[in-house]
From Swiss-Prot:
It comes from the Bacteria. It is a single-pass membrane protein. GO terms for biological process: photosynthesis. Belongs to the PsbJ family. GO terms for cellular component: photosystem II reaction center; plasma membrane-derived thylakoid membrane. The gene is psbJ. InterPro entries: PSII_PsbJ, PSII_PsbJ_sf. The chain crosses the membrane at residues 35-55. This is Photosystem II reaction center protein J. One of the components of the core complex of photosystem II (PSII). PSII is a light-driven water:plastoquinone oxidoreductase that uses light energy to abstract electrons from H(2)O, generating O(2) and a proton gradient subsequently used for ATP formation. It consists of a core antenna complex that captures photons, and an electron transfer chain that converts photonic excitation into a charge separation. It is found in: Cellular thylakoid membrane. Keywords: Membrane, Photosynthesis, Photosystem II, Reaction center, Thylakoid, Transmembrane, Transmembrane helix.
Length: 65
């Protein structure tokens, strides 16, 4: 078992000398779900929801014509 893991199994943020335990590159690309994948899915969902609002403003009850 690694010395870096805490009692709950998570890796600590810093080594004893103050350096980060995990580089920013690994924090960005590793884990249960990579952060870039979560950000991409979230951004796509936001664009989709905004698209629904814009579509609704030009069609249906709210349109000017």
């Amino acid at each position: 078992m690694s010395k870096l893991k805490g009692p709950d199994g998570r890796v600590g943020d810093r080594l004893p000398d103050g350096r980060p335990a995990i580089s920013w590159q690994r924090r960005w690309t590793e884990g249960a779900l990579p952060l870039w994948l979560v950000a991409t899915a979230g951004g796509t969902a936001v664009i989709f929801v905004l698209g629904i609002f814009f579509y609704g403003s030009y069609t249906g009850i709210g349109n000017a014509g």
